[in-house]
Amino acid sequence: MKRTYQPSKLVRKRRHGFRARMATASGRKVIAARRARGRKRLSA
């Protein structure tokens, strides 16, 4: 059986990267929430 996690740097960046987050209103909310918490890494 194939495992569910098949790592790919490109897919990771496209789905969870900073630019992907900034592209939607809810994504911008995610970034804002992570900034408010003081996260060192905002996105993938």
From Swiss-Prot:
GO terms for cellular component: ribonucleoprotein complex; ribosome. It holds the Pfam family Ribosomal_L34. The keyword Ribonucleoprotein applies. InterPro entries: Ribosomal_bL34, Ribosomal_bL34_CS. It comes from the Bacteria. GO terms for biological process: translation. Keywords: Ribonucleoprotein, Ribosomal protein. One of its GO terms (molecular function) is structural constituent of ribosome. HAMAP family: Ribosomal_bL34. Belongs to the bacterial ribosomal protein bL34 family. This is Large ribosomal subunit protein bL34.
